[in-house]
Every structure is written in structure tokens, then in C-alpha cells.
Amino acid sequence: MTVIINGSGLTIEKVIDVARHNEKVKLHPDALKRIKTCRAMLEKKIDAHEIMYGVNTGIGEFSEVVLTDDQVKEFQKYLIYNHAAGIGDPALIEYVRGAMLGRINVHAHGNSGCRPEITLTLVEMLNKGVTPYVCQKGSVGACGDLAPMSQIALLMLGEGQAYYKGKLLDGKDAMKKAGISIPSLQARDGLSIINGSNVLTAMSAIFLYDSNNWLKQAEIAAAMSLEALKANMKPYSARLHEVRGFKGAIRSAEAIRKLVEGGDLKEERIKCKVQDAYSMRSTPQVIGTAHDALDYARSQVEIELNGVGDNPVFFPKEDLQISGANFQGSPVSLPMDMAGAAITMVSVMSERRLNRLNNPALNVGLPAFLTKGAGMFSGMMLSQYTADMQIVEQRILSAPASIQSIPAAADQEDFVSMGMNTAIKNFQILDNAYGILGIEFMAAAQALDFRDYKFGKGVKKAKEIIRKHVEFLDVDRPLYKDHTAMKELVKSCEILKEVEKIVGSLE
């Protein structure tokens, strides 16, 4: 289904549709009209020699330098050359496509002053699969994601590089093969492409989408471990969580109740302790807190997706232009720091349940390290080491980037959001989280195979899916293949999809 871009209504799910699943986009006629109206106003101001930042002045520390008419014509090209200053590995194609989509939606408001050809070229690039090559590192998150967005803007000059039909080509060749005209850059055009936190925001949208799916799988893994450990299910009572009132905890407790429905544990046919350890008893409060953190981050990201992140901002009705700081990435970077920490927190609890499954003093009659041949075999002993290493890395990465500002540009840009650092480290946190949760899934399935009572319908289905990918650990074998297979299984969301067919949505 084609995504209509009109400056509003752009959700995280629509970003996924376009960035990951290559849905087509279309600029709404009203948006195109607004872009043309704003451009007409800007050109009148240029003709009148009204001073406008980044149009007929330099940028940053050079904002007081007024450009001649001849310099205005060439300035945007050199602006993009100078700012295409990134380094390192290429950003994923879905990150770049998401950033392009976000920038089109900024332009759709009609406050950016670019020529309509610029916006329409971005639309055409998305629809024909031309994705600029963008270095992942280089942005400090203000004035927007200048370095990565400049590599997108290079395509408007027929320069840079781009992916097209699976190949990395020179920008000019990619555009030619796709049948896209190169629009060039005139006054304001270049800055209108780069002066917003669109890469940060696109990466954050994708992270939140994937993290929500990961959290739902964390609830499935928790339910499996709880059944294997004969947990007391009274702490999952709806009344208990409703009386406190946190939405995330209410949601998480409900999800886990669905997963254990129909099993002996839920029906109280198994003897349990009066009170379990926190890693078993407070799962809804902890995963629920992560849900709430992601919900807040989502609200901030979707505001940014649908707002005018630009500078200067033009108001055609009032014949007005205002220079400000609507490029500042802090409204996204701070909540996204919290979102990354939330995934780490839930990963820590997952590892604690893994410990209880392995530890013969805590695992309620299961064999030590989940092996039948203790001494000769060590079972899942080393699996915990692998999880622990990843936990420590997550903890290091959970230090907030949003407070790490370093002044630049001769102190003109003396506070920046460091939002790209947040975005990059969050995906490292999530990558580790896939592995940690995969190991808990594997251990929980192993533990359940030692139990002879009836499991909840969601738990039973999850174990069936796991056994299609990883066999029961009868005797010791190299586990790195199993760990990797489980990590990929979690990333694929196969367990989640199949379990939700049985128990319904875990949202």
C-alpha cells in the first residue's frame, strides 16, 4: 500500500513499511502546493537581498558572512561537499531510506524553502530503490545529522555513491540507471536536505519497532522459565497490577497469563513457594517499565517524524523566516538513551532467570546445569558465561550519550545532542539482547523437557518452535552453533508470530 506523505500521520509502522519493506510513497498534492508556495516566498526574499541564514550567508561561525549573488548560486554545492565528512561503515539501507522518508515529511509542511524538485527527487529515489551510501559515523545530532544527510544530498549533484539493484554505484550512474533526473542544488536546497535529525529519528523508529517485538518475546521466554521453575503465579494477578496502575506492568502481566493459560501451573495443580525471588516475581514490573519507556520514546520519535526539524524555518502566510534550533536532536536522544537502558534492564533479568535454571540450589529439582550427566557433562554452564559477557557490554553501552556534548564550530555549536551515538549503541544493545534472550529460550526449553506436567498453550508452542531449530542437549556438544541459531530465531520473531497465533496478540 502506498504511503501518502502530507507532513502528518507518519508512524513508526509506516517508517518500517517504507524503509524495510520498500513500500512506495506519494507526496500529497496539498504538500506539493505548500512547498511551491514557500519556495516562491523565498525567491522573493532572495531577490530583495533579505539576509537569511544558510541562503545568502555562511553557516555556523560564518553566519555573519554575507554572500554575493554569484556566491549564493554556488554555495549549496560547497556546503554539501564540506559537510559530507563522515567516516566508518555504511549505514544500513533501511536507516537511509527511513531518513529520506522523514526528510520528505519535513518538506511536506511547506516551511523549508526548497524547490519542489528536491522533494520529488527524494520521493522518486525511494520508489525506484536508489539509496545513497552513507557513512554511519560523523553526526553529533545538531545542526541535525549533517554529515550523513550530506551524503544523501550529494546525489542531487550527481555525485556520491548509491545502492541500486544490489550494487554500489557512482551516484550519477545509479540515478541514470533508475531513470531519475539530477536536479542540482540552488539557493537553500542543500541545507533543506541536511538540517534535521532524520537519520537519528529513522534509526530510533526502527529500534523501537524491533525492541517492542523483542520485549514481547522476553515475556514468552519468562513464561517458559516460570513454568520450568514452578513459579507462584499469584504475582501476575490482574487485580494486583491494576491497583498500582502502571500500564506497562498491567500489559506484561496479562501477556504472561495468556502464555501459561491451560497449564498445570496456572491451574494451581503444582505446589509452589509462597514467594519467589524477584527475578521470577517482579517480571511484569520490570518488563512493564521497559514497555512504558518505549511508549514514551515512541511518542517523542513520532512527534519528530511529523514536525519541522529545520533551520531556518519559513512561514509563507506571514512572509516570515525565523532562525532557531529545530534541528536539535535532544528531544529524541534523551528518551532513546532511556529506551536502550530499558532493553539492558530486561536482559539482566533474563540472565538472572538463566542462572536459576542452571543452579541446582535454586532450580527446584532440575539437574545441575540442565544436564543428565553432571560431572562428565557440563550442560549449559558456559551458556551463562556467554550471556554474562553480553550483559556487561550492554551495561557499558547504556551510559547516556545525550549528556556527552562536546562544543564545536568555534563554540557556535556549543551544545549538541550526540544522538547518533545513542542510535548506534542502541542497536548494539539490541543485538546483544537477541543473543541473551536466545540463551534463556534454549535453557528454558531444556528445563521444560525435564518436567512431566502440562504446560501453558503459549509456552508449549514456543518450545515446539525452539525444538525445530535446536535439539535437546542430551550430551555435551559445541554450543556456539546453538547459541547463534537461537539468536537468529529471536531476531526472526518466528516464536512470537507462532505463539500469537495460539494465544492472541501480546500487545
Where are the regions a protein language model picked out?
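Glycine-rich, flexible loop motifs
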Residues: T2-E13, A19-H49, Q76-T131, L226, ...
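C-terminal auxiliary extensions adjacent to catalytic cores
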Residues: T2-E23, L27-R34, C38-M41, I46, ...
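Polyanion/phosphate-binding surface patch
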Residues: E50, V65, S252
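FAD-binding core of FAD-dependent oxidoreductases
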Residues: Y53-F75, H83-N105, C135-L157, K172, ...
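Short gly/ser-rich anion-binding loops that grip negatively charged ligand groups
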Residues: V65, A85-D89, A108-S112, I287, ...
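Catalytic or ion-translocation cores adjacent to nucleophile or general acid/base/metal-coordination motifs
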Residues: D69-A84, R356-A368
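Well-ordered mid-protein domain cores that form the structural environment of catalytic cofactors
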Residues: A108-N127, T131, A142-A147, G166-Q186
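Short secondary-structure capping/junction motifs at helix and strand boundaries
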Residues: K128-Q136, W214
